[in-house]
A protein has these predicted regions:
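Single-stranded nucleic-acid-binding OB-fold domains
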Residues: 18, 76-189
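Sliding clamp-binding short linear motifs
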Residues: 1-99, 174-188
């Protein structure tokens, strides 16, 4: 059906055709989007089907990423490409955290998951797993004093400042502050 074909086009299943998604949408609607007219037997002239000639329709990588986000709940490409404000910021690589044990650092990460907890004193705290730009994962602890000011609410890129700690040989970041980077505007609706 047309609906399923449009979903396949939107998910970039037809990349191999080297046609843009917009061109494929038009072709799909042209071929499947209307009902065939029943030819009357009394027509004087037989009309031929018109061929479809479209201008170059271009879509951007950001549009594709937002389509994927809408369809799957995540982008198939690098998650950092949908955000701004993190470029040019200092970020200590996870591979170097051993040099910064019990010291303050800044790291930039994409939220993989957040677990919200309530302490025995009825205060909120969070545990998080983030992905660094290189793809490496790191864990964070957000104690109540900082969690109340810097709640991680949704997936996105965060600039995290905190203290590197080691627990049973695994490094984690005890977060002091978390700044949420802005998402690029969706060009499909501009």
């Amino acid at each position: 059906t047309l609906e399923f074909l449009l979903l396949l086009i939107k998910s970039e299943a037809f990349r191999f055709t080297d046609k843009s998604k917009r061109s494929l949408f038009w072709e799909a609607h042209y071929l499947l989007g209307h009902k065939e007219k029943i030819e009357s037997t009394l027509s004087l002239f037989k009309s031929s089907k018109k061929s479809l000639k479209l201008p170059e329709l271009i879509s951007s990588e950001i549009e594709d990423a937002y389509d994927q986000l809408e369809l799957f709940g995540f982008s198939l490409g690098h998650p950092f490409r949908l955000f701004t404000e993190w470029q040019g910021q200092e970020s200590v690589s996870i591979k170097d955290w051993s040099k910064y044990l019990n010291n303050h650092i800044q790291v930039i990460g994409y939220v993989v998951t957040i677990k919200n907890n309530i302490t025995k004193h009825r205060q909120q705290m969070q545990f998080g797993t983030f992905q660094e730009f290189s793809g490496d994962l790191f864990d964070t602890v957000h104690f109540p004093m900082t969690s109340n000011k810097n709640i991680i609410r949704r997936n996105g890129i965060y600039i995290l400042k905190g203290i590197v700690k080691s627990d049973l040989g695994c490094f984690n970041l005890e977060v002091i502050s978390a700044y949420s980077c802005a998402r690029l505007p969706d060009p499909r609706y501009n």
